[in-house]
């Protein structure tokens, strides 16, 4: 199998400023030290053709940051991502303009992807049909529910037939019938040996079609491997975490976050 995505020592840092004065000092003074948050810390993994990788972890662990870097909408501070093929990212409202109608968003997003108007015209009916939006396709997206936005975004991205698909919680909203239709489409992609990254808190969906699991905790890759090896460990952790009181859960999160802040 060929490597489709190679994530090499990826770190994503955010400088934290309490005042504009701190921001100015950081811009003007060489090697000025400031509080820095590590959203991701030295993550490396390889994805092969046909892999369906579930990105799991509690809220704030860094899953969406990693998916955005894989998709190319966010750049790492350190490290690199090599991609072998076209990438599409499906997240709620990703790449959609609230001021434009649904059909205008189809054209705008596909133009940004590099498609010609003739190609867009030919593909638009398929996108509208898959989205099930009907007459709402002519309404501004700002009037859409989160489920409708997810339907439109998913329909555009699966119709353009990418080599690598990144799905970030896009199936967590909307009706279950549409979600199942999306999963069926993802199965088709899987059979075509495409690479899929799937961010979800729905472990039923993760178990249903993922082949591998990347467990992100506190911005670090805690574990990565075959579904049957990693998912039971994560489920055991999650069961223990849910048994904690709200105060204990907060303390656990705070300890993880404290380790992600450094002065540099």
UniProtKB/Swiss-Prot annotation:
Major location (coarse): membrane
Domain of life where this protein originates: Bacteria
EC identifiers of the protein: 7.5.2.4
Family matches, as InterPro entries: AAA+_ATPase, ABC_transporter-like_ATP-bd, ABC_transporter-like_CS, ABC_transpr_TagH-like, Bact_Polysacc_Export_ATP-bd, P-loop_NTPase
Single GO term (MF): ATP hydrolysis activity
Binding residues for ATP: 57-64
Compartment(s) of residence: Cell membrane
ABC transporter domain: residues covered: 5-243
Membrane topology: Peripheral membrane protein
Reaction(s) this enzyme catalyzes, per UniProt: ATP + H2O + teichoic acidSide 1 = ADP + phosphate + teichoic acidSide 2
An annotated GO cellular component: plasma membrane
UniProt entry keywords in alphabetical sequence: ATP-binding, Cell membrane, Membrane, Nucleotide-binding, Translocase, Transport
Transmembrane segments: none
Annotated Pfam families: ABC_tran
UniProt cross-references to SUPFAM superfamilies, sorted A to Z: P-loop containing nucleoside triphosphate hydrolases (SSF52540)
Subunit structure as annotated in this protein's UniProt entry: The complex is composed of two ATP-binding proteins (TagH) and two transmembrane proteins (TagG).
Function recorded in the entry: Part of the ABC transporter complex TagGH involved in teichoic acids export. Responsible for energy coupling to the transport system.
Family: Belongs to the ABC transporter superfamily. Teichoic acids exporter (TC 3.A.1.104.1) family.
Protein name: Teichoic acids export ATP-binding protein TagH
Source organism of the structure: Staphylococcus aureus (strain Mu50 / ATCC 700699)
């Amino acid at each position: 199998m060929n490597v489709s995505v190679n994530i090499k020592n990826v770190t994503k840092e955010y400088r934290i400023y309490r005042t504009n004065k701190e921001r100015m000092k950081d811009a003007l003074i060489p090697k000025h030290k400031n509080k820095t948050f590590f959203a991701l810390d030295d993550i490396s993994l390889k994805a092969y053709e046909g892999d369906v990788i579930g990105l799991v972890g509690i809220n704030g662990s860094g899953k969406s940051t990693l998916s955005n870097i894989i998709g190319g909408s966010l750049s790492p501070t350190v490290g690199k991502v090599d991609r072998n093929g076209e990438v599409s990212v499906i997240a709620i409202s990703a790449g959609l303009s609230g001021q434009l109608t649904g059909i205008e968003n189809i054209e705008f997003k596909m133009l940004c992807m590099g498609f010609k108007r003739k190609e867009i015209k030919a593909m638009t009916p398929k996108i509208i049909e898959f989205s099930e939006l009907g007459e709402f396709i002519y309404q501004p997206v700002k009037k859409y529910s989160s489920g409708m936005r997810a339907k439109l975004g998913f329909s555009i991205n699966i119709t353009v037939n990418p080599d690598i698909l990144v799905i970030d919680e896009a199936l967590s909203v909307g009706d279950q019938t549409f979600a199942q239709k999306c999963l069926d489409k993802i199965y088709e992609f899987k059979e075509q040996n495409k690479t899929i990254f799937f961010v979800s808190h729905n472990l039923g969906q993760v178990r249903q079609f993922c082949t591998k699991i990347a467990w992100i905790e506190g911005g670090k890759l805690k574990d990565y491997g075959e579904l049957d090896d990693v998912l039971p460990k994560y489920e055991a952790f999650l069961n223990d975490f849910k048994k904690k009181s709200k105060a204990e859960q907060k303390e656990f999160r705070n300890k993880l976050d404290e380790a992600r802040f450094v002065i540099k």
